[in-house]
UniProtKB/Swiss-Prot annotation:
InterPro entries: DNA-bd_dom_put_sf, EF-G-like_DII, EFTu-like_2, IF2_assoc_dom_bac, IF2_II, IF2_N, P-loop_NTPase, Small_GTP-bd. Belongs to the TRAFAC class translation factor GTPase superfamily. Classic translation factor GTPase family. IF-2 subfamily. Residues 179-219 have a biased composition (Low complexity). Disulfide bonds: none annotated. The gene is infB. The lineage of its organism: Bacteria, Pseudomonadati, Pseudomonadota, Betaproteobacteria, Nitrosomonadales. The keyword GTP-binding applies. This is Translation initiation factor IF-2. Residues 378-547 form the tr-type G domain. One of the essential components for the initiation of protein synthesis. Protects formylmethionyl-tRNA from spontaneous hydrolysis and promotes its binding to the 30S ribosomal subunits. Also involved in the hydrolysis of GTP during the formation of the 70S ribosomal complex. It comes from the Bacteria. Residues 487-490 are annotated as: G4. It comes from Nitrosospira multiformis (strain ATCC 25196 / NCIMB 11849 / C 71). CDD domains: IF2_eIF5B (cd01887), IF2_mtIF2_II (cd03702), mtIF2_IVc (cd03692). Residues 412-416 are annotated as: G2. Residues 523-525 are annotated as: G5.
Length: 876
């Protein structure tokens, strides 16, 4: 290898040449110029110096064994749910080569021989070359042992060496020559001019101290001398080398008993190690608690019995036992509601706390933009048209659409869309058609103010009807202003003043009379007052100052939804704020999906929709519920997570309420309470509400009326299928079944009853419930007989000759045998004869012969009492 100078070596190390010169001089290398050459010995000397000043140690003859141990623990999070945590324990053990053992020996005390004294040896059998080679090897081994002894002594002064179990070598270790041997500062020098016999004696002396059982090596022989028997015995006493992990040592002591406070010793004397020190127990040793442990249990909205037991660190059987004492029959996987779970926790002596709702829906609140940060713009009013049937509501809407929608779009309007918008000279108006008011009721129940105005349609020739009053109640409950449209004003029998008077009784006062409600007279046939109606709506909207942000994520509500055979789930959505674009990710209740197609009320494709614009969207995962709120998100994965969470939450809450088998429902579960299931369809909402209320009043402790479904309209195929599944009776009040439903009724044999008078329906249902009730049984005594004679006949048995004292006796009558005033038998007559003829009946004052079925213990003087059971039907 070519030598390099100081400057080249400094550039290779990345340091300044002047700094390298200072380090070389401090290490004892005499170099003064950057052009001076460096040898391998100089580099090694510099390396040893740097190791010494930095505290580095040579790692010779060491083996490091890393060890990893993975385990899994379960810990409850902030919501109370158990979470699995992976725990990894890393350990490292270092083993030193056995030649490093004699650390207590002081190499400096090894006496140097004054004169070579060669012990007597056998006659050499090898040549001189081999003998010289063997002596050279022994000399190298002596130098190595001396050097290692010095290094170990130096290390012992620096730090305490680790304690390891090492087997002492039985024979000298093979020669180990380092790559660049450097003598330590305290190493014993070995003179090169020592006579050839001295190295052998030095090796023998060192080995005699380190391992006395090993005899001195004999020079000039090819075989090892025999070991003496006593030396073999000494070797057997020494244990073999073992690699032992401290963490795996098992303490074989007495079992720790409950209540023992002796520091986990269990009353046994601790074992001592080879140095006389008492071994301490493992820090993770289990000690049984001496008093009950009270846990703080976080209870979520719903939790299973097994999970609740795990939180309290008890068995699930204990929780089930506590619930059974409270009257709940549950299983280990059954869901409990929060209130029940907290009562159980308190009953078992733990502390129950409401768990923080770990709901993905919190993501919606975090991502919601504050209204103050958004730019608010004016939006069109949303108007709902309400009114009684046949009051001209449909005609009014058709006239507005026909005159205010472009002629090219008039034929393309899809009638099933329940919302559309109209352009006027003063702005746009969005109309919301909610037949039956079902969607409006669902929206108001969810607290969503969808409608800004209500147009109340009242026929001028008919007056205020029940559904009109119902519409007024809906509007007042939602705190929505009303504009009254009096239709059919062109008819001769129209009477607007009567309409005003009737509406005043419902607290709807016109402006002419000092109120706040605008009244407009319109005619859907001639078009009279249509412009005034739209003008009134827009004027009322200006007073309300309707505003909504446009440049924001879309929010809205589901108006209608259905399942289309060709397009899948389809929902009509009203955008309330923001802008809905094609491709946005929507979340509607438990449904989610990407907007794949968006249509307006004309059936045309649109790319975006602003506030107060109704659109029909496709691409949701399922059919959403009418009245559900819709929000646009940016992350489809988060939308799916929230939707699945809502589905699971709804299912868990439903199961927790349904599965709880209370003790008070035991009789009903055993079938002792009979249930009559009904499906009611009526022409108007008021009719089925009144009929439902009247029928539910018929329920008693023995029979119960269960209204499975009630609605407005004709009896459909779905109603018949529901009746088949639930074994219910279908009642049509001023309503008939359609053609498809009639075919299913005839084929399946479903009981369908039609009524037009509410009292007829109530009377028939009452009669049906009376037939389901258990009848009343009444006992009537028919006759009294006295036994005058008893005849014993071998084939027949005992036959009694009797006299009828009162009433009459019939064949097959029920009879009691009375002896000394006590009833000894209750049974039935087997035969009845007068003289030798069988008779059906014997009246008072006549004698007869009779025998009892399965009873022969009759005596003279006994009395027979005949009776019959009368069944009386019960009524409500």
């Amino acid at each position: 290898m070519s030598q390099m100078n100081v400057e080249q070596f400094a550039s290779e190390l990345g340091v300044l040449p002047t700094v390298l010169l200072e380090q070389l001089q401090a290490a004892g290398v005499r170099k003064h110029m950057t052009e001076d050459s460096l040898t391998e010995k100089d580099k090694t000397q510099l390396l040893e110096y740097l190791r010494k000043i930095h505290g580095a140690k040579e790692e010779k003859g060491r083996i490091s064994l890393p060890r990893r141990q993975t385990s899994e623990i379960k810990k409850a999070d902030s919501t109370g749910k158990p979470r699995s945590i992976q725990v990894e324990v890393r350990k490292k053990r270092v083993f030193v080569k056995g030649v490093d053992l004699p650390v207590e020996r002081k190499t400096a005390e090894i006496p140097a021989p004054a004169a070579p004294s060669v012990p007597p040896v056998r006659t050499p059998v090898i040549d001189a070359a081999q003998q010289a080679l063997r002596q050279e090897e022994a000399r190298r081994q002596a130098e190595l042992i001396a050097r290692q002894a010095a290094e170990l002594r130096e290390k012992r002064l620096r730090e305490r060496p680790p304690v390891v179990e090492i087997k002492e070598p039985e024979e000298p270790a093979p020669p180990f020559v380092p790559a660049a041997p450097v003598a330590g500062p305290e190493a014993v020098p070995v003179a090169p001019e020592t006579p050839s016999a001295a190295p052998g004696e030095t090796v023998a002396a060192v080995e005699a101290e380190a391992a006395p059982s090993q005899p001195a090596s004999t020079e000039g022989t090819l075989h090892k001398p025999a070991v003496k028997p006593e030396e073999k015995a000494d070797k057997k006493k020494k244990p073999a080398k073992q690699v032992v992990w401290k963490e795996e040592k098992v303490e074989k002591r007495g079992l720790k008993t409950r209540g023992d406070l002796s520091g986990a010793k269990g009353g046994w004397r601790a074992r001592k190690d080879k140095h006389g020190r008492t071994e301490e127990p493992a820090p993770h040793a289990f000690s049984a608690p001496t008093e009950p442990v009270v846990h703080e249990v976080l209870v979520p909205e719903t939790i299973s019995v097994g999970a609740l037991a795990q939180k309290m660190s008890i068995k699930a059987a204990e929780v089930i036992k506590a619930l059974m004492k409270m009257g709940n029959m549950v299983t280990i996987n059954q869901m409990l509601d929060q209130e029940t779970a907290m009562i159980v926790v308190e009953e078992l002596g733990h502390v129950a706390k409401y768990a923080a709702l770990d709901s993905p829906e919190s993501f919606l609140a975090d991502t919601e933009i504050a209204p103050s940060e958004l730019k608010m713009e004016a939006r069109a009013p949303v108007v709902t048209v309400m009114g009684h049937v046949d009051h001209g509501k449909t005609s009014l809407l058709d006239y507005i659409r026909r005159t205010r929608v472009a002629s090219g779009e008039a034929g393309g309007i899809t009638q099933h869309i329940g919302a559309y918008h109209v352009e006027t000279e003063r702005g746009m108006v969005t109309f919301l058609d909610t037949p039956g008011h079902e969607a409006f009721t669902a929206m108001r129940a969810r607290g969503a103010k969808v409608t800004d105005l209500v147009i109340l349609v009242v026929a001028a020739d008919d007056g205020v009807m029940p559904q009109t009053v119902e519409a007024i109640h809906h509007a007042k409950a939602g705190k929505v202003p009303i504009v009254v449209a009096m239709t059919k004003i062109d008819k001769p029998e129209a009477n607007p003043e009567r309409i005003r008077q009737e509406l005043v009784t419902q607290e709807v006062v016109p402006e002419d009379w000092g109120g706040e409600t605008m009244f407009v007279e319109v005619s859907a046939k001639t078009g009279q007052g249509i412009d005034d109606l739209l003008e009134s709506v827009l004027l009322q909207a200006e007073v309300l100052e309707l505003k909504a942000p446009k440049d924001a994520p879309a929010k809205g509500i589901v108006i209608e939804s259905r399942l289309d055979k060709g397009r899948g789930p389809v929902a009509t959505m009203l955008v309330q704020s923001g802008t809905l674009k094609r491709g946005d990710i929507l979340l509607a209740g438990a449904a989610y999906g990407r907007v794949r197609a968006m249509l307006d009320e004309s059936g045309k494709q649109v790319e975006q929709a602003g506030p107060s614009i109704p659109v029909e969207i496709q691409g949701l995962s399922e059919v959403p519920v009418a009245g559900e709120s819709v929000v646009a998100l940016t992350d489809e994965r988060k939308a799916r997570e929230i939707a699945l969470f809502r589905q699971g939450k709804f299912r868990d809450v439903k199961l927790a309420k349904q599965q709880a088998a209370k003790l008070e429902n035991v009789f009903e579960q055993r079938g002792e309470v009979k249930v009559l299931s009904l499906i009611i369809k009526a022409d108007v909402q008021g009719s089925y509400e009144a009929l439902t209320h009247a029928l539910q009043q018929l329920s008693t402790d023995e029979v119960k009326v269960n209204i499975i479904h009630s609605g407005v309209g004709a009896i459909t195929e779905s109603d018949i299928n529901l009746a088949l599944a639930s074994k219910a009776v279908v009642i049509g009040f001023n309503s008939r079944a359609d053609a498809v439903a009639r075919k299913l009724i005839n084929s399946a044999g479903v009981d369908v009853r039609y009524y037009s008078i509410i009292y007829e329906a109530v009377d028939e249902i009452k009669a049906a419930l009376s037939g389901m009730m258990a009848p009343e049984r009444k006992e009537n005594i028919t006759g009294l007989l006295e036994i005058r004679e008893v005849f014993r006949i071998s084939k027949v048995g005992a036959v009694a000759g009797c006299l009828v004292q009162e009433g009459f006796v019939r064949r097959g009558s029920l009879v009691r045998v009375i002896r000394n005033g006590q009833v000894i038998h209750t049974g039935e007559l087997d035969s009845l004869k007068r003289f030798k003829d069988d008779v059906k009946e014997v009246r008072a004052g006549f004698e007869c012969g009779l025998s009892l079925k399965n009873f022969n213990d009759i005596q003279v003087g006994d009395q027979l009492e005949t009776y019959e059971i009368q069944v009386i039907a019960r009524t409500l």
